[in-house]
Structures are given as C-alpha cells and as structure tokens.
Design a protein with these regions (language model features):
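Flexible, small-/acidic-enriched active-site or ligand-binding loops
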Residues: 236-261
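A short core secondary-structure module
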Residues: 188-238
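Glycine- and acidic
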Residues: 64-69, 89-95, 113-118, 129-134, ...
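Short helix/loop capping segments that flank catalytic or ligand/cofactor-binding pockets
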Residues: 23-25, 99-102, 170-172, 193, ...
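Short Gly/Pro-enriched turn/cap motifs at secondary-structure boundaries
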Residues: 167-170, 198-203, 244-253
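A glycine-rich, basic-preceded beta-loop-alpha segment at the flavin cofactor/substrate interface
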Residues: 255-289, 306-324
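Amphipathic, small/basic residue-rich leader segments at the start of a protein or domain
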Residues: 1-127, 134-156, 170, 186
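A gly/ser-rich beta-alpha-beta helix-loop segment of oxidoreductase catalytic cores
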Residues: 160-180
Length: 325
C-alpha cells in the first residue's frame, strides 16, 4: 500500500531541477541536525562583547521623529545618518572600515530599531543581509573588495539586490532576467535585459547587485547559468525611477530596469564565478533568513506584548482591570 502511494506521489511531483539540487547541496547544517538526530552537543557558554557604541544607538532611537522614512522628501536625513554612523557595516570586517558584529548583537540592534519603526528597521536590515556587501565578502575579488567595501561601510554606497521580477520571486530562478555574452567594440561583454521589481532600497540605492541567467550561444566564454554582477547607479541605460509604495509601507522599494552592457569583471568574483550565482545566493541567505527577518518579527512581538500588557492594566470591566480577571 505504502509503495503504491509513494509511486503515485512520485509521479505527480516534478523532478528536482538543477537549481534546486544546487540549493540542497549548498551551505551546511546547524544545531537543527543535532536535534533531529538526537545527538546534541551543548557548546560552552559564549560571552559576547558588544562592539557597537550604545550611545550611537540611543541617539538614533531618541532623535528619530517617527515621520516615515519613505515616502518622505527628507528621507535622506535618516538614511545618511545610518550610513555615516556605520549602521550599514555590521557584516564588514574592520580592515574595510566596518564593525562586524556577532549574530547576537546584530539581532538585538535590529530588534530595537524595528520596535521604534519597522520602515527604519528594514532600511537598516537590507544592507546587512543578502546583497552586494555579503556577496563581496564571501566571493568578491580583492580588487572589488577594496573598491566597494569601504564605501559600503561608511554609507557612501547604499546597496540593494535585484533578483525578483514579474515572474520570479519565491521561485527565484523562474523566468529570471537574461544576459547574453557578445562582442562589442572588440571585447567580450554581457548584454543584460533588466526588469526587476519589488526591490527594497532600489529608489535610493547607488550600488546594485543583479542576478540574471547568462546565455552564451556562440560559446565565447564557454560558461552559462545564473550569474551575479555589480552595477552602479550611474551605469548607462540603467533606470531606477519607478517606486512601489504599497500601503505606504514606509521604506524605499521599486524597480530596476534597462538594457545594459556590463564587463566580465563586473561579475562578483570575476569571470571564474560566471554561472555560480545560484550557489552563491543560497550560501548567503542565512544572514537575512536566519537573523534579520526573525529580529524584525521579534520586535513586532515585543511591541504587541508591551501594548497589550499596558492596555489590560487600564481597561476595566466588571469594576476591575481585565488583566486581573
């Protein structure tokens, strides 16, 4: 019976694609593996030493005037404050001007900021999650690291990452933008047709990471597949003038469009990483999926709990606070 059911389900479920197989083989396991196998090795207690100045965070939280970060004609005020005060550098090593934090400290800071304003939390979260910074740290060439990481650390560069499009989102590689290897002016370049949307920080970013499916029909370089490259805002034919503001969500979000030509050395890590983009993305999702997003959820839970706790003390029914019932 079970074999029959198994074969029935097997016929209905699509086969694992190459990109899904790469995702399954990427990265490693954490304590979840130990829990599922029943062999948990408790590590010794870790003492965290906080690196980020408390007065810096206090200044942000006390001076923030609760006007939306976006849409706001004065949105640069707080974005510039975050950049200049190292809030975009929490993944970057000190040698590049960053303040690399422990997971614990990063989570605590994001939780506190998001509890004041979710939009401000998102603006802080994105540069410290999957994007140009983390991809450069793990896969960038030394030349790329020296060029971009100091600017990301001090806020000169505001990053965003363009993966999502009209027909791909959770299914990240479904109908993804295409790139074509070709020769132009005597050298090999990549022609990329961009149609990205729902890209957080896109309207204000000046350094974009873009993902696309590279095709090489003439076998000019002998490599194809999902590829990740860097593009600056000033790049010819790049368009970032459309904004998404659903429900006045409070953080910059928009599109990245245009038909552009990029050099092979704009691929993160250089030509050797052409076609490795999907693996790179899967191995760098942990900061956002495992730290940043849970921190924002933690903030929402704490704010809701705080509000409910205070409400039940002042809301009376049957001549007593409802919290005493």
């Amino acid at each position: 019976m079970y074999r029959t059911l198994f074969n029935l389900v097997k016929r209905k479920i699509p086969k694992i694609s190459d990109t899904e197989l790469i995702a399954l083989r990427s990265g490693n396991t954490s304590i979840d593996r130990d829990i599922l196998t029943g062999k948990i090795n408790y590590p010794e207690k870790i003492t965290y030493q906080n690196k980020f100045p408390k007065d810096n965070l206090s200044t942000l939280l006390t001076q923030y005037d609760h006007t939306p970060v976006y849409p706001n004609s004065n949105n640069n005020k707080w974005i510039n404050f975050l950049g200049k005060n190292k809030y975009f550098s929490f993944l970057i090593d000190e040698q590049y001007g960053g303040i690399k934090l422990s997971t614990n400290e990063l989570s605590n800071i994001l939780t506190k900021i998001t509890s004041v304003d979710p939009g401000l939390g998102v603006v802080t979260m994105v540069p410290n999650s999957l994007g140009p910074g983390e991809l450069l740290i793990h896969y960038g060439s030394e030349e790329q690291k020296n060029k971009y990481l100091p600017g990301l650390a001090d806020g000169s560069y505001i990053p965003c990452f363009g993966l999502t499009g009209p027909n791909n989102g959770s299914d990240a590689t479904g109908s993804i933008d295409k790139g074509l290897v070709m020769e132009k002016d005597g050298k090999k370049v990549i022609k990329v047709s961009l149609n990205k949307r729902y890209i957080t920080l896109a309207p204000v970013a000046n350094l974009m990471g873009i993902a696309f499916e590279l095709q090489d029909p003439d076998n000019l370089i002998g490599k194809e597949g999902v590829t990740v490259a860097l593009v600056e805002r000033s790049h010819p034919n790049l368009i970032q003038n459309t904004h998404h503001i659903p429900l006045n969500a409070g953080f910059p979000n928009g599109t990245i469009k245009g038909e552009i030509y990029i050099d092979l050395d704009q691929v993160i890590g250089g030509e050797k990483n052409i076609g490795n983009g999907w693996k790179m993305l899967m191995e760098c999702l942990s900061a956002g999926r495992g730290v940043s997003l849970p921190a924002t959820a933690n903030a929402s839970s704490k704010v809701a709990s705080f509000g409910m706790y205070n409400y039940i003390k002042v809301r009376d029914q049957f001549k007593m606070p409802i919290g005493n019932m």
